[in-house]
């Protein structure tokens, strides 16, 4: 705040006290409203998330971000970061490329496919997050991972994963890839995850359609421990119907279902 007049600094402090927003957001909102405190706070409360994101974007040093992209870009194709660049990117963050943290970053970048970021995905993604250095991104990661506790955001993350994981041009997701990603994103969230994966590997052995992928999350959220609340007449994919038929004797200790 050292470049501000004392009267402006006072307004920044008042804005922060009133809204609980950070200094960067406060300065952005006040400058957008010509330092009229009442109008700035009204604007913030009408759309706090949007204004916070806008202030984050404006704080990014574009030249610094371009230099950072240059560290990772593919030497054969300057419009993307390839496998080697992704590995360096993960190393700089001290992350395993197969970790859920890297998948969260890919989600935030809206990456189209595994093992690469396009130039646009990287630059737009980092800008949206307000990051122009790996230090900033690393510091932000815990907050990004916390977003997965929000039901709507996790659903978006989960559905993004299907598109990200499948081969471009294919409608379905290869079974082995689906199982690997389910282990990553549904561990601790879907009580029948191990049983589901065993069932697929033993009895399905085919690719997974998008509809089945998406509805498995709904199934996992609603199904009872003994599966007694499953409605065979509901609009579930056949694969989930078959799984319930396979799994019920297992989860009920071998007893036959009355349904």
UniProtKB/Swiss-Prot annotation:
One of its GO terms (molecular function) is cullin family protein binding. The modification Phosphoserine is found at residue 55. Changing residue 211 to A: Loss of interaction with CUL1, CUL2, CUL3, CULA4, CULA5 CAND1 and RBX1. Does not affect both nucleus and cytoplasm localization. CDD domains: UBA_DCNL2 (cd14412). Residues 60-248 form the DCUN1 domain. Mostly expressed in liver, kidney and brain. InterPro entries: DCN-prot, DCN1-like_PONY, PONY_dom, UBA-like_sf. SUPFAM superfamilies: UBA-like. Changing residue 241 to A: Loss of interaction with CUL1, CUL2, CUL3, CULA4, CULA5 CAND1 and RBX1. Does not affect both nucleus and cytoplasm localization. GO terms for cellular component: cytoplasm; nucleus; ubiquitin ligase complex. One of its GO terms (biological process) is protein neddylation. The keyword Phosphoprotein applies. Keywords: Cytoplasm, Nucleus, Phosphoprotein, Ubl conjugation pathway. It is found in: Cytoplasm; Nucleus. Pfam families: Cullin_binding, UBA_4. Residues 8-45 form the UBA-like domain. The DCUN1 domain, also known as PONY domain, mediates the interaction with different cullins. The DCUN1 domain mediates the interaction with the N-terminally acetylated NEDD8-conjugating E2s enzyme leading to the NEDD8 transfer from N-terminally acetylated NEDD8-conjugating E2s enzyme to different cullin C-terminal domain-RBX complexes; the neddylation efficiency correlates with the DCUN1D5-cullin and DCUN1D5-E2 interaction affinities. Interacts (via the DCUN1 domain) with the unneddylated cullins: interacts with CUL1, CUL2, CUL3, CUL4A, CUL4B and CUL5; these interactions promote the cullin neddylation and the identity of the cullin dictates the affinity of the interaction. May also interact with regulators or subunits of cullin-RING ligases such as RBX1, RNF7, ELOB and DDB1; these interactions are bridged by cullins. Interacts with CAND1; this interaction is bridged by cullins such as CUL3 and strongly inhibits the neddylation of CUL3. Contributes to the neddylation of all cullins by transferring NEDD8 from N-terminally acetylated NEDD8-conjugating E2s enzyme to different cullin C-terminal domain-RBX complexes and plays an essential role in the regulation of SCF (SKP1-CUL1-F-box protein)-type complexes activity. This is DCN1-like protein 2. It comes from Homo sapiens.
